[in-house]
From Swiss-Prot:
Keywords: ATP-binding, Cell cycle, Cell division, Cell shape, Cell wall biogenesis/degradation, Cytoplasm, Ligase, Nucleotide-binding, Peptidoglycan synthesis. Carboxylation is probably crucial for Mg(2+) binding and, consequently, for the gamma-phosphate positioning of ATP. The gene is murE. It catalyses: UDP-N-acetyl-alpha-D-muramoyl-L-alanyl-D-glutamate + L-lysine + ATP = UDP-N-acetyl-alpha-D-muramoyl-L-alanyl-gamma-D-glutamyl-L-lysine + ADP + phosphate + H(+). A motif (L-lysine recognition motif) lies at residues 405-408. UDP-N-acetyl-alpha-D-muramoyl-L-alanyl-D-glutamate binds at S43, T161, T162, S188, R196. This is UDP-N-acetylmuramoyl-L-alanyl-D-glutamate--L-lysine ligase. GO terms for molecular function: ATP binding; magnesium ion binding; UDP-N-acetylmuramoyl-L-alanyl-D-glutamate-L-lysine ligase activity. It is an enzyme of class 6 (ligase). It comes from the Bacteria. Catalyzes the addition of L-lysine to the nucleotide precursor UDP-N-acetylmuramoyl-L-alanyl-D-glutamate (UMAG) in the biosynthesis of bacterial cell-wall peptidoglycan.
Length: 484
């Protein structure tokens, strides 16, 4: 619960309070005792003791009217909608949501050790490594793109990489109730752009890498804006871990100079000196030989990043070693074998850079024909389409089948044609994703061949016109076509 007095105190201290407006009268304080027992930004989830946040560019007064009909008595907004209830007017509703929900849930962030990962790719894999390292001797909760757990037993799919602040602090409070000791999070650039983690300080923040992504009309207008919002995690962490091989490393290095930090990768103290398919050796703070189930040097680097972060949280080298050896990630480099010996790789690679690294790993182990099944999502990350084409052009022997991948409100054929326009040779377009996978499965001949199904990973749905339509998932579909 939270009182109106506490809300006004929070907003005034953050210089985010304008006034309370009710029936054209302006108030700096509110003399009546009002207590709220629920917070909501969904007008369909309202009771008489709910504080409602009228947020978003698409918010309509009809939503507020519906909430008032359901018993709403107070709301927070950047705009006065002229309703017959008081409005707390603020300059920035997203900041208000974060700080008010933090207090409403009794500051759960102070009762957990917080570990956050950011980067264009690898966040989920690194989070899973950290989860397995910590769970050897601790009770970690995890908020991940792939799966979320607040008790270490039950897992559910997240809708956003980083939840809205009201949901985030509610989930943190649930983790505290479940006696969890740590919280591992993926923090997206959008989370900082939309202030979902405003006011939150992490015990350790990890910056894995950066490459152009999430640039478009409803995301970041430029790469500079994307990169800037990624770097905000560094400013809001008590200690940081940074990949020394990442693009634009020098500015990040300067930014973290006075923050406790570890660098990993080439030209740093913590570097891989030997890399094999299922083991690697590290020198530096983590010096040891590690067994690993996820192939690819980039996965080994993600393991190092997670290990250095966990080391700062007091985890032993032995627990880090055990955690790395136990880690698997749904939809990340999952491998099937056809009856003819050919391999099928199912992976979440969903931008140009992650596709480039995936192809490099597969080509290292499979020397025959390689077939790529790929699509791009609609209404987001539009720069990926050209990036995919550029990567494919660097692999002239790659056979390509373009297909649907969460087209949302766009036409999947148009998306596929746009990707194809950036490819310098003919490709096949099969919009039905299962049909595309079935077709690819007929093109292999021997154990040297491989099929790569990229983009969706373990997602068992297709986003079409704003809805999550049923889809078996790439791995389950691929299993149907193993006989070849």
């Amino acid at each position: 619960m939270i009182t109106i007095d506490k809300i006004l105190e929070i907003l005034k201290n953050d210089h985010n309070f304008r006034e309370i407006l009710f029936h054209e009268h302006y108030y700096y304080n509110w003399t009546q005792n009002v207590t709220f027992n629920a917070l909501s930004y969904d007008s369909r989830q309202i009771s008489s003791d709910t504080l409602f946040f009228a947020k978003g560019a698409t918010f309509k007064k009809e939503y507020l009217d519906s909430a008032i009909t359901a018993g709403l008595s107070f709301y927070v907004s950047e705009t006065d909608y002229g309703a017959d209830i008081p409005v707390i007017l603020v300059n920035d509703i997203k900041k208000a949501m974060s700080l008010i929900s933090m207090s409403f849930y009794n500051n759960p962030q102070n009762k957990l050790k917080l570990l956050a990962f950011t980067g264009t790719k690898g966040k989920t894999t690194a989070a899973y490594f950290a989860y397995h390292m910590l769970k050897v001797n601790h009770r970690p909760a995890m908020l991940s793109t792939m799966n979320t757990t607040l008790d270490g037993k039950s897992f559910f799919k997240s809708h956003l990489t980083t939840p809205e602040s009201l949901d985030l602090f509610r989930m943190m409070a649930t983790a505290v109730e479940n006696q969890m000791t740590h919280l591992i999070m993926e923090v997206s650039s959008q989370a900082y752009l939309t202030k979902r983690v405003y006011g939150l300080t992490f015990d350790v923040g990890v910056f894995l890498n950066i490459s152009p992504d999430h640039i478009g009309p409803i995301e970041h207008p430029t790469f500079e804006d994307y990169f800037f919002h990624k770097r905000l995690l560094m400013e809001n962490s008590n200690a940081v871990v940074v990949n020394s091989q990442m693009d634009h490393f020098n500015i990040v290095k300067e930014q973290v100079e006075y923050i406790p930090h570890d660098f990993y990768g080439d030209y740093s103290e913590n570097v891989i000196t030997e890399s094999k398919a299922f083991s690697f050796h590290v020198k530096g703070k983590l010096e040891n030989t590690y067994d690993i189930k996820l192939i690819g040097k980039f996965n080994q680097e993600n393991a190092i990043a997670a290990g250095l972060a966990c080391l700062r949280l007091g985890v032993s080298i032995e627990d880090i070693k055990n955690g790395i050896a136990q880690t698997t990630v749904p939809g990340r480099m999952e491998v099937l074998t056809q009856t003819n010996g050919a391999k099928i790789f199912v992976d979440y690679a969903h931008n140009g850079d992650s596709l480039k690294k995936l192809l490099a790993v597969v080509e290292e182990h499979q020397k025959g024909d390689i077939i790529l099944v790929l699509g791009a999502p609609g209404n987001k990350g539009q720069s990926r389409r050209k990036d995919f084409g550029d990567v494919i052009n660097q692999h002239p022997n790659l056979q390509v089948i373009l297909t649907a991948d969460d087209p949302n409100f766009e036409d999947p054929l148009v998306i596929s044609q746009e990707i194809a326009s950036h490819i310098n040779r003919p490709v096949t377009i099969i919009i039905d994703r299962e049909e595309a996978i079935a077709n690819a499965s007929t093109l292999t001949n021997c154990k040297l061949d491989a099929i790569i199904i990229a983009g969706k990973g373990a997602d068992a749905y297709q986003i079409i016109k704003g809805n999550r339509d049923n889809y078996s998932g790439d791995l389950e579909v691929a299993k149907k076509y193993l006989k070849r």
